[in-house]
Amino acid sequence: MGNAIREKTIHGIAASSGIAIAKAYRLETPDLAAEKRAVADVEAEVARFEAAVAKAKEELEAIKQHALEKLGEDKAAIFAAHLLVLDDPELLNPIKEKIQTERVNAEYSLDETASFFISMFEAMDNEYMKERAADIRDVTKRVLAHLLGVTISNPSLISEEVVIIAEDLTPSDTAQLNRQYVKGFATDIGGRTSHSAIMARSLEIPAVVGTKTVTAEVKNGDIVIVDGLDGQVIINPSPELLAQYEQKRARYEAQKAEWAKLVHEATVTADGIHVELAANIGTPDDVKGALANGAEGIGLYRTEFLYMGRSELPTEDEQFVAYKTVLEQMNGKPVVVRTLDIGGDKELPYLQLPKEMNPFLGFRAIRLCLEMQDMFRTQLRALLRASVYGNLKIMFPMIATLDEFRQAKAILLEEKEALLRQGVAVADGIEVGMMVEIPAAAVMADQFAKEVDFFSIGTNDLIQYTMAADRMNERVAYLYQPYNPAILRLISHVIDAAHREGKWVGMCGEMAGDPIAIPILLALGLDEFSMSATSILPARAQLKQLAKEEAARIKETVLSLGTAEEVVSFVKRTFSLA
C-alpha cells in the first residue's frame, strides 16, 4: 500500500442496527478548564453565574422542544430532567455560597461543586444515579461554556453526510442529530442502555459505542464504516472492503424492506400456530412506532415515565388522559399496563425516599405502592376510568409473595367498586396479572397461577436476581446469562404452571426479541413476545420460518444441558443461526 492510509478495525458494542458509510466528523469537546481566581465583587459574580444558568435554560428549553417533536415525550423527558438540575437548590446554593464565602470565580465554584456531586453519584452501584451524574455533567458543561464564552458544538448545524466520532454523545448532542446528514456515530464510551444508544435506536441511526479508542484513531475526513450490526468501526477501508460493506448494507436494507411487508400480517408459525408479538412502550408517543412496526398489542406500558422529569406526582386526570390515549390508539388490541415501578434504578426526587444500601433489593415497585397507597390508588383509578376505551390488562411489578398480589388486587377491586358506586363506567373482565422477575415468584408459579389471569416474565431482573449479578457491573456482567439452563428451567416452570391453569404467559425482557432466544421460547410454549418496536418485524419473519411442533422437540434437550454456551451452540446448530 506504500504510504497510503492504512485500514483499521476497532471493536465496540453494537448499539443501534444498520450500516453507515461516510466521512468522519469529530465532535470535539471544547476546553472548559475552570481556573481558580479571586473576585472582588462577589454579588456581581453570583449575578454572572445566574445569567449563565438562565442562558443554559433557554438552550435546553429549545432542545427539549426539538426532542419532543422529533423523538417523543419520553426522550424529551431527559431534558426536562436537565432543566430540573438547573432549578435544584441543592446544586445551585452551594455554588453561590462558595463564590460568596471563598470569594472565587463562578467557573471554579461550579466546576468544584458539580465534580463533587458527579463523583458521589458515579460511586453509587445504581444505574439511575450514574445517569443523574451524566445529567449534571451535561448541564455543567453548558453553563461553563456560557461563563467562559466558549461555543459548544451544535450537531444540528451539520450540512453534509457524516459519521460522528466522539468520546461520548450527551443527550442534548443526540437529540440535535439530523438524520438527513448524520448517518451514524461511534463513541469511546457508553453501552447499549446509555442515553445515546437509546436515542440512536429511536432515530434509527447505526451506532457503535464503547470502542475505547475511536477518537484516538479517527481524524476529520477519514472514511469510516459504522457497523451497528456486528459492533465494528472500520477506518479508511480498502476499496475491496468498502465494496463488501456496500453489499452488506444493501442486503440489510433489502431485508428491512422484506420485513416491512409483514407489518399488517399476524404472527403465525410455519405450522399455523399464532403467536402474539407486542411492543414495549414508555409513553403514548411510542404507540405510533409500535403500530408502524406491526405490533399486535402492547405487552409492556412502563408508566413510570409519567412520573419522571417533573417536580410533583402526576394527577389522576393527567394519567387518565395518557392511558386513554394509548388504549384508543391501539383500537381494541391488548394493552398491558405495568403499575408504577419506581425505586432501584429509577428514583423520583419529590418522593424524598431514603437512600438504600441495595436499592434493587429494597423499597421499590409494588412494595413502595402498597405502602404509599394514596399514590397507588390514584394510578389505579386512572387506569380503571380509561379501561372503557380499549382492551386494558393490568399487571403488578416485583411481586414476591401471594400476599402482595392479593393485597394489590384487593386495592384495585376496592377502587373499581368505589368508581361504580359513583356512576363511573369501568370495563368488565379486566385481566389482572403480575410480572415474574423474582425467583421466589417463579418457583411458586403453580400457586400464583391459580389467582392471576396472566404472567409476564421480566427477564432483565429475573436473570440478575437468579444469577446474583448486576448486568451494569462490567466485572460480573459475564454472569448475566439469558441462556443459562437455570434461567430456562425457571421460564419453563412458569409457562407450564400457567398453562395447567389455562392462563397465558408473556415475556417483556430484552430476551423476547433475541433471535437465539425465539426458537427456545417457542419450544417452551411462550404465548406472547413483547419487545422494542424495531425488533418486531425481524422476529415475525423468524417465527414464520419456525414450526412450533418442530421447536417443541428441542425442549427436553435444551433443559438438560449444563451451560449457557452449550445451549447457544445447540440452538445455533439446530436452527442454522449465525
From Swiss-Prot:
The reaction takes place in three steps, mediated by a phosphocarrier histidine residue located on the surface of the central domain. The two first partial reactions are catalyzed at an active site located on the N-terminal domain, and the third partial reaction is catalyzed at an active site located on the C-terminal domain. For catalytic turnover, the central domain swivels from the concave surface of the N-terminal domain to that of the C-terminal domain. It comes from Bacillus sp. (strain S). Homodimer. The active site is at H195 (tele-phosphohistidine intermediate), C508 (proton donor). One of its GO terms (biological process) is phosphoenolpyruvate-dependent sugar phosphotransferase system. It catalyses: L-histidyl-[protein] + phosphoenolpyruvate = N(pros)-phospho-L-histidyl-[protein] + pyruvate. InterPro entries: PEP-util_enz_mobile_dom, PEP-utilizing_PTS_enzyme, PEP_util_AS, PEP_util_C, PEP_util_CS, Phosphohistidine_dom_sf, PTS_EI, PTS_EI-like. Mg(2+) binds at E437, D461. Belongs to the PEP-utilizing enzyme family. PROSITE patterns: PEP_ENZYMES_2 (PS00742), PEP_ENZYMES_PHOS_SITE (PS00370). Keywords: Cytoplasm, Kinase, Magnesium, Metal-binding, Phosphotransferase system, Sugar transport, Transferase, Transport. Pfam families: PEP-utilisers_N (PF05524), PEP-utilizers (PF00391), PEP-utilizers_C (PF02896). Its EC number is 2.7.3.9. Transmembrane segments: none annotated. The gene is ptsI. Its cofactor is Mg(2+). Phosphoenolpyruvate binds at R302, R338, N460, D461, R471. The keyword Oxidoreductase does not apply. It is found in: Cytoplasm. General (non sugar-specific) component of the phosphoenolpyruvate-dependent sugar phosphotransferase system (sugar PTS). This major carbohydrate active-transport system catalyzes the phosphorylation of incoming sugar substrates concomitantly with their translocation across the cell membrane. Enzyme I transfers the phosphoryl group from phosphoenolpyruvate (PEP) to the phosphoryl carrier protein (HPr). This is Phosphoenolpyruvate-protein phosphotransferase. One of its GO terms (molecular function) is metal ion binding. The N-terminal domain contains the HPr binding site, the central domain the pyrophosphate/phosphate carrier histidine, and the C-terminal domain the pyruvate binding site. GO terms for cellular component: cytoplasm.
